[in-house]
Amino acid sequence: MLATLGSVAATVQMTTRSAVTPRLLPGELVPAASALNGISFGVQLTLGPALAGVLVASVGFGWTYLVDVVLFTTMFLGIVTLPKMAKAEGVERPGWKSLKQGIDFLRNAPNIRMSFIVDIVAMTFGRPHVLFPALGAGVIGGGAVTVGILTAAMAVGTFLASLFSGPVGHVHRHGLAVGRAITVYGGFVLLLGLTVLGMQVGLANGLVADVGKTFPDVNWIALGVAAFAMLGMGASDEISAIFRSTMLLMAAPDGMRGRLQGIFTVVVAGGPRIGDLYIGVFATLVALWFPPVLGGIVIIGLIAVLVRVQRTFRAYDARTPTP
């Protein structure tokens, strides 16, 4: 129950915070704001669990949750003291009618719609996280430590891409940039799959030393390549996210931004779950290496076709944003 309430609250908070950004900042600073959000997300995924682990080990769960309560209370007090924003034009009372209007608007907004579609493609065919325990147990070795390294590598990539994203503000062809970033993402997914394939073939034919569930028994070369692939996935996904978020925030009118941001949240949350199903099914039916290899190829191929077919998306210019 608490986890469900926390997830619902986080979704509402994220949607609202993203939707108000263009009303607080001039248009040229929106990409920087999206990058700053990526830095925040990267810090949360890297430092947050580490700090929680230290607190749990030193003072226990009770005091750790108390620290969490204090931090959330401080954040809440900061929010309630903010000045009230003027009501945006064209905003209606929330309800099913409002949701339907958002969906109807999306049908006639090819650029925003395509930004959702390409993200679904990337997240469906390029989310190898459910493979990590199996990789740590018998392919790369290293057990739980390997799982942690591969998971953290993507968050580090997200953080670094956001930290050094200054040149992003000088790019105006956002649709083309999104397509290229996701293509690079697919390349890193393919690299991870080929690494797993190489290890499985090597282990089966005695070409590489056996690995184990303890970290000293890890294959260091395979772990390094896999971690590099995950870091690259995090970085390229964050670059894509910066451009996609900026397109949504700048091209959508005030009255529709919140509703579209809600749909965007559903895409971001739902795509990875479909991806987990895809990875799990094909890893079970074929082999561990198959879903990331096929996924990387599918991502690269589909993105090339989609960007070529949707000419308005390819030609999208941030200086004249159109939905």
Place the predicted regions along the sequence by residue:
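Cytoplasmic helix-loop-helix junction between adjacent transmembrane helices
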Residues: 2-45, 49
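Structural signature of transmembrane alpha-helices in multi-pass secondary transporters
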Residues: 6, 37-45, 122, 154, ...
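Small-residue-rich segments within alpha-helical transmembrane domains of MFS-like 12-TM solute carriers
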Residues: 7-15, 123-127, 234-242
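Transmembrane alpha-helix boundary/hinge residues in polytopic small-molecule transporters
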Residues: 15-16, 20, 115, 131, ...
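Helix-loop junctions on the cytosolic side of multi-pass membrane transporters
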Residues: 19-23, 61, 65-95, 169-172, ...
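A gly/Pro-rich, aromatic-decorated transmembrane alpha-helix motif that marks the paired
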Residues: 43-55, 273-282
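Juxtamembrane cytosolic amphipathic helices that cap and anchor the N-termini
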Residues: 97-122, 221-225
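C-terminal transmembrane bundle of multi-pass solute transporters/carriers
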Residues: 100, 107, 132-133, 137-323
